[in-house]
């Protein structure tokens, strides 16, 4: 159930819907090029919307889930066309495919903390920054 809610929220392209999965003071750590931390639903919503705006046709696919108590590990693939700038990465119309893993600590049905791990070099290469 958790993974289908996650997929539906991300694939809705609505940052507020993604943020609604988090506890009021839930924390999202994006760990790739450098760690970025978003605390609270408002920050999570903004961060999610920036991703969804940069890749407006993006699709999140869950490839595997492991659950143990209040911890859930989700292996995923994110695909989309990089249309708008994302931070220092220019949107050039290139297709992006990122594989990653998210580790969630839940408080009941809500995300208390998420640590997102993905390959930053793949994103940089797709944006034309690397080879």
Where are these regions (language model features)?
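C-terminal and inter-domain tail/linker signature
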Residues: 1-131
